[in-house]
Amino acid sequence: AGNRRPIWIMGHMVNAIGQIDEFVNLGANSIETDVSFDDNANPEYTYHGIPCDCGRNCKKYENFNDFLKGLRSATTPGNSKYQEKLVLVVFDLKTGSLYDNQANDAGKKLAKNLLQHYWNNGNNGGRAYIVLSIPDLNHYPLIKGFKDQLTKDGHPELMDKVGHDFSGNDDIGDVGKAYKKAGITGHIWQSDGITNCLPRGLSRVNAAVANRDSANGFINKVYYWTVDKRSTTRDALDAGVDGIMTNYPDVITDVLNEAAYKKKFRVATYDDNPWVTFKK
C-alpha cells in the first residue's frame, strides 16, 4: 500500500463559494475554478459562462476576491469552514480576453489578489497548493509577472505553493519550449482534455505520461478532463494519470474503491507534494 499512486480528484467548474463544500463532500480533494479578467487585466469574477459542460449551470460566479476569501476559510486549519481534504486548487485563467502584451500584468494583478485575500499577506493564510492554468502558450509572461510581484511584495517563498499548466492541448514539445522561455523547471502539471459533451481519445495523455516518466521529461503530473463516466475513469487511471477532473467526484471515488484500483491508487492528501513526480 506504500507504493500506490496518489490521485487528485478535481472538482470541475467550482465557481461559487457554496460549491466548494458541495464538491469536497462528494469526494474531491482538489477543485478547478475559472477566473475571468476585465479589460485592464484585473482578475474579476470566478466565471465560466456559456457554453460549458453538458448538464452544468454555466453562470454561477463570485467576485474573484470574495471567492478567494471563501477558499481561504476552507483551507485554513482551525477555521470553522475548514475542509482538511481540499489540498489543491487549479485556477483556469481565462486570458483569451486579453492581448498578449497584458499577460505579465495579469500575472502581477493575480499575485496581488492572492497574496492579500488568499494567503493573508503571508500570515496563516490558506494552505492549498495552487496551479496557474494558462490556455495560451503565448501568455507565458503571466508566470514571470506573478513571481515578480510576490518577490516585490516580500513573499517569494509562496512560489513553493504554486505550480503551472498550459491547458490548450498543444504539442507537448511546444509546451516544453514555452516553459523554457518562461524559465520554469518543476512544479509542472500537464492537462489534456475536452468538454464532457464530446469524446476524446487518450493519445495525448499517453504522450504526456511518457514525458513525465522519461529521464529527461519536464512534466511532474498529468491530469485529464472532464471525466464523468466510470469507464473513462478506468481508462484514465490505466493510462497512468495523476489527476482526473470531473463534474461528479463521487464517480471517481467509486472507481478508486474498486478492488483492482484500490491496490494501485489512493486519494492524495496534504502530505503528497503535488510537484513531485510519482515513481512507480
Swiss-Prot record:
Record's protein name: Dermonecrotic toxin LsSicTox-alphaIA1
Binding site for Mg(2+): 32, 34, 92
Protein's job: Dermonecrotic toxins cleave the phosphodiester linkage between the phosphate and headgroup of certain phospholipids (sphingolipid and lysolipid substrates), forming an alcohol (often choline) and a cyclic phosphate. This toxin acts on sphingomyelin (SM). It may also act on ceramide phosphoethanolamine (CPE), lysophosphatidylcholine (LPC) and lysophosphatidylethanolamine (LPE), but not on lysophosphatidylserine (LPS), and lysophosphatidylglycerol (LPG). It acts by transphosphatidylation, releasing exclusively cyclic phosphate products as second products.
S-S bridge residues: 52-58, 54-197
Compartment(s): Secreted
Family per similarity comment: Belongs to the arthropod phospholipase D family. Class II subfamily.
UniProt GO MF annotations: lyase activity; metal ion binding; phosphoric diester hydrolase activity; toxin activity
Recorded superkingdom: Eukaryota
Organism of this sequence: Loxosceles similis
Keyword Lipid metabolism included in the entry's annotation: yes
